[in-house]
Each structure stands twice: as C-alpha cells, then as structure tokens.
C-alpha cells in the first residue's frame, strides 16, 4: 500500500472514524496504512524525522487517529518493525544445520531490512528511557521466538550443552550484530556459519 493511498476519500473516512461512536470497530485499513507509512518514512528520513505528524500526513489520516492507536511514536515504530508472530524454525529434516541455516538466514534477512536498521538505534535509546516499552517488545516478539527455538530442539531430539536460552541469545546476537553492521551482504554464508556454531552446542537428548 503506498503512502498516498489513503488521501482524499480516506481522509473523510478517518473523519468519520474520529467521531465518538461507542462500540465501533477500528478500521484495520487505517492501521495498515499507518504502519506502512511508518516503514516508508524510516527508510526515507530516519528515526528522528519519522514523527507522528509526518506519519499521519503520509498515511492520509489525522494525528489524533494515530494517537488513539499508539500512545507514542516509539510504540508505533516498535510495533511496525517488530510485529507479533515473528520467525520460528521450520521443517525438521533430521539434519540440524539443514534446518537452522534457513532459519538463521530468515532472521538475518529480516533484521537487514532498511526500515529496521533505521529504527533500531532510536529504539534502543527509547528502551532505556521507557523500560515498559522494552518489556512489551520482549513479550510480543523475543520470548515467543525463544520458546519456538526451545520447541524445535525438543522436537528434533536435541538438547543444548549450555542453557538453551543462552544459546538462542548467542545465535540472535550474532545475527543482530551482522544485520546492523553489514546488512544482507554475504547473508547465506554467515547464516550457515551461525547454524554450525549452534549445532556444535547441541547433543542428542538422553532417551531420544
């Protein structure tokens, strides 16, 4: 959806939405337009210039309409770049590297997105100022990913020689740092290297 897609008629729709109507459901098209505008502006103008007013103009809605959905710019950006239901290991082939290499590549490719690379430095500052935003991010995105990794290990009949949360953090930290520093350059080779490191810390589960 382009940033200008909700101008004109949509402004009228937004004005109607602004009117207080008890029980009226929120229009998901407006939510999508706001999130898309946020991602576009992060790439074009950077974190600091991506203001609520700029987002509203790009999305073709009013600033109050944005604030009714998200209490702050940081909350909106955090949700736009780190939505719920993020990545999980997929097919269990019996070969851990074969399973984990595409998973690592998926994470690295995702984190290398220009909008995310633009947002992360600003969000890290916001997390220090507003710890509740950090906790919200962990609950929505990070902890579900960690749990899905644990579930994958259990299904594959493997256990970690170190605590599995530490192993996941090492894996994600390596991918996160690479994405910020290098983007997607050499992503496939790096993802395979990380998968090999993770595999080296695994062993068959006793009794599996």
Regions found by a protein language model. Name each.
Residues 1-45, 49-58, 64:
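Basic, helix-initiating cap at the start of DNA-binding domains
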Residues 75-81, 111-139:
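Amphipathic alpha-helical segments used for helix-helix packing
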Residues 118, 131-158, 165:
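Amphipathic alpha-helical packing segments from all-alpha helical-bundle domains
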């Amino acid at each position: 959806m382009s940033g200008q897609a909700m101008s004109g008629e949509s402004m009228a729709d937004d004005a109607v939405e602004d009117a207080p109507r008890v029980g009226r459901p929120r229009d998901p098209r407006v939510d999508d337009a706001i999130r898309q505008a946020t991602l576009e502006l992060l790439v074009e103008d950077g974190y600091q210039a991506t203001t609520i007013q700029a987002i509203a103009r790009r999305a073709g809605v009013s600033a109050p309409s944005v604030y009714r959905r998200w209490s702050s710019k940081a909350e909106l950006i955090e949700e736009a770049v780190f939505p719920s239901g993020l990545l999980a290991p997929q097919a269990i082939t019996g070969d851990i590297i074969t399973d984990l290499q595409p998973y690592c590549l998926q994470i690295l490719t995702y984190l290398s997105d220009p909008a995310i690379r633009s947002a992360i430095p600003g969000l890290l500052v916001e997390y220090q100022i507003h710890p509740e935003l950090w906790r919200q991010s962990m609950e929505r995105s990070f902890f579900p990913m960690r749990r899905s990794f644990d579930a994958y290990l259990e299904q594959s009949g493997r256990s970690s020689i170190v605590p599995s949360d530490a192993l996941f953090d090492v894996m994600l930290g390596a991918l996160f740092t690479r994405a910020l520093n290098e983007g997607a350059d050499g992503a496939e080779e790096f993802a395979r290297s990380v998968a090999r490191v993770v595999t080296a810390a695994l062993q068959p589960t006793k009794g599996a």
